Amino acid sequence: MKTQIVKLLADNPKGLRSRTISYTLGINFFHLLDLLSEMQTEGILYRESYVDLANAENYILWKLNS
């Protein structure tokens, strides 16, 4: 599953939100969060946060460390 996440993020260099990854790969959202946390600890991924000022929403994008 981690390989699929890496491939998906490699195809989307601007990053993806957790829910987008979950829907695309068809895996349980909470299981995905555990995997993303593991991958961040392993140094494979990092999180980038930003606020969409127009909608006042916080976003967290997952990206590959390169």
Tell me what each language-model feature is.
Residues 9-13:
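Short helix-to-turn junction characteristic of helix-turn-helix DNA-binding domains
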Residues 43:
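Glycine-centered, phosphate/nucleic-acid-interacting loop/turn motifs that mediate DNA/RNA or nucleotide
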Residues 27-38:
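Short amphipathic alpha-helical interaction segments
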Residues 21, 34, 51-52:
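Proline- and acidic/polar-enriched loop/turn elements at helix boundaries
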